[in-house]
A protein has these predicted regions:
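Non-transmembrane, aqueous-exposed alpha-helical and coiled segments at domain scale
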Residues: 2-21, 27-522, 555, 567-575
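Short glycine-rich, low-complexity segments
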Residues: 525-528, 539, 561
Length: 575
């Protein structure tokens, strides 16, 4: 894959030039293509065996019911409501923790066959797109259903880049956050701040029908995709104490992102095109993955009619969770702990004996090799050829090889997933672990937007309101407080006293009372915020490429697997 990456990167400027020429000739962007750009390779097998019916006998009553099986291979859950057996008269419901076998919507955006290890965007295999397409081209297909023509792609790319700048008040809101704020928290704050702009396009202010206009939908889509990298650049540099370079609308999407990170005051700086292409492929691979936790959150929020910025922010908040977006950092820590290839057998024995955890293997959906992991391994080799080989890649490759040959892992269908190699790529590109989830959120915003747009025209769409299985007390009388005893549950009142509370209880008189709550005088527990002068000094230190505390080894002076690369070295690597 490495040679083709270099070739495609070298031809990118020429390709964009052709698109610009086509756009200058007066062509327009048709955002609802009707002709399919790519034939159907084969017919889809009948989902779930096809339509029919399911005969159910309720052994409680002896009654027999016929439940319809729809052409998509599913049973409408509402059909169960007819099954009753006295009691409270309620119909039968499904108990499905985690929505393991529940489909809340129908979608045409992406397809996964977990047993075969298949992922397709709008029918296009992910491997083909990674080899031949770009992130923004694939984003167009995800949002609008088909690959764009040359003229459409040119206008799509240019429109997104024209909307890459942030409003000044949004930048001010970011700069008001703590200097060591987590970058995902900054992304969330930025998206929520953006939701307050353009009130004329907010359904809560203008009525629920405002998004039924395609032009209004499309404007929000290009705005969010365009601004995600700029938000990320500000999140990155909020922690370094420097300002990102302004967006360069003449560059490609991933290229402009690296430019904002590294150009500083040099408007002529250009990122390495091969590194930019590698990052573009990573964006493409992470753009969409059907009904995952954060995408489901986006559709859930959108069902309420909330503005799209709030819906995307809620989805990004779900991605912030360590069980969803933070697994690649855990993989890095695992590989660093193994350290050398000769330690792998002992580590695998520890996994089998439940003494070790193996991250980056297995998936909620895939019971085969995650197709994205294969591509990312090739991208890793391309990046290492430019910036130097990370010794942990040898550990990763050998760990994969031995796990795939071990009956213990094969029988449990534990194969490498997308997180196994992605952290190594991001570390080689000079990003600290705290930023990995941001690099996930940037492209996944496209998937959220595709689902948001699809939900707007879904005839089955209604506000999502799952049911619950109630198991609490049935009916209780209210007791006056004078006659109550102390609650005995071990789950009550677990708040630890703050330092300020301890001082007050010790009899120390605090002069910082009004409006402080239980926090110390500094307002953030027992840690004093840095003065503005201190922040400037820390931010200007060239060896601090990223985040003040809890840095990855390459950014804090620590060593992992022999890598003591400083932050400034990472900057020079990307250049």
């Amino acid at each position: 894959m490495a040679p083709s990456l270099a070739v495609r990167a070298a031809s990118r400027v020429e390709s964009l030039t052709r698109h610009v020429v086509a756009d200058a000739s007066g062509s327009s962007l048709a955002l609802n293509p009707t002709a399919s750009n790519g034939g159907v390779a084969s017919a889809r097998p009948t989902p779930g065996g096809g339509p029919g019916s399911l005969s159910v006998v309720d052994n409680r009553t002896g009654k027999k019911y016929e439940l319809p099986i729809e052409p998509g291979g599913y049973v409408p859950s509402a059909a169960l409501k007819q099954i009753t057996a006295g009691g409270d008269g309620a119909g039968l419901r499904l108990f499905d923790p985690g929505y393991v076998n529940t489909a809340p919507c129908k979608s045409k955006i992406s397809f996964i066959d977990g047993d075969a290890g298949v992922l397709r965007y709008r029918g296009y295999p992910i491997e083909t797109l990674a080899e031949t397409s770009t992130y923004l081209e694939s984003a167009f297909a995800l949002v609008y259903g088909d690959l764009p023509s040359a003229a459409q792609l040119a206008e799509w790319e240019q429109t997104i880049m024209r909307h890459s700048a942030l409003p000044v008040p949004v930048i001010a809101a970011i700069e008001a956050l703590p200097h060591d704020a987590h970058p995902m928290g900054i992304i969330l704050a930025g998206l929520n701040a953006l939701s307050t702009f353009h009130p004329e396009q907010n359904p809560a202010l203008q009525g629920g029908d405002i998004y039924k206009t395609h032009s209004v939908q499309d404007k929000q889509i290009v705005r969010i995709i365009g601004k995600m990298t700029t938000l990320a650049a500000h999140a990155y540099h909020r922690n370094t104490g420097r300002a990102p370079a302004p967006p360069n609308q003449k560059l490609g999407y991933a290229e402009n992102f690296l430019y904002m990170l590294d150009a500083g005051l040099d408007p002529d700086h250009r990122p390495n095109p091969r590194l930019a292409k590698a990052l573009d492929v990573m964006f493409l691979l992470h753009a969409e993955h059907e009904m995952n936790c954060s995408t489901a959150a986006a559709r859930h929020l959108a069902s309420s009619g909330v503005d799209v910025y709030s819906a995307v922010a809620g989805a990004v908040g779900a991605l912030y969770g360590p069980l969803h977006g933070g697994a690649n950092e855990a993989v890095l820590k695992m590989l660093a702990r193994i350290e050398r290839v000769e330690n792998i057998p002992a580590f695998l024995d520890g996994v089998k004996n439940k003494k070790e955890k193996m991250f980056g293997f297995g998936h909620r959906v895939y019971k085969n090799f995650d197709p994205r992991a294969k591509v990312i391994r090739a991208v890793a080799e391309e990046v290492f050829s430019l910036v130097g080989r990370d010794p942990l890649i040898d550990v990763a490759v050998e760990l994969e090889k031995r796990a795939r040959a071990d009956p213990y892992f094969v029988s449990r269908k534990l194969y490498p997933n997308v997180d196994f190699y992605s952290g190594l790529v991001y570390r080689a590109l000079g990003f600290p672990p705290e930023f990995f989830t941001v690099l996930f959120a940037i492209p996944r915003a496209t998937g959220y937007l595709a689902h948001w747009r699809e939900a707007l025209t879904d005839p089955d769409q209604r506000i999502m309101r799952p049911q619950q299985i109630y198991e609490g007390p049935w009916l209780r009388e209210y007791a006056p407080i004078e006659g109550r005893r102390d609650a005995t549950s071990d789950q009550m009142w677990q708040v630890e006293p703050s330092n300020a509370s301890r001082r007050r209880l010790a009899g120390v008189v605090s002069t910082h009372r009004a409006g402080t709550g239980d926090h110390a005088a500094f307002g953030r527990g027992d840690v004093a915020p840095l003065s503005s002068a201190t922040r400037e000094v820390e931010g200007s230190d060239p060896n601090r490429r990223a985040f003040g505390r809890g840095l990855g080894p390459a950014f804090s002076g620590g060593v992992v697997a022999g890598d003591a690369t400083s932050g400034v070295d990472q900057l020079m690597r990307r250049r």
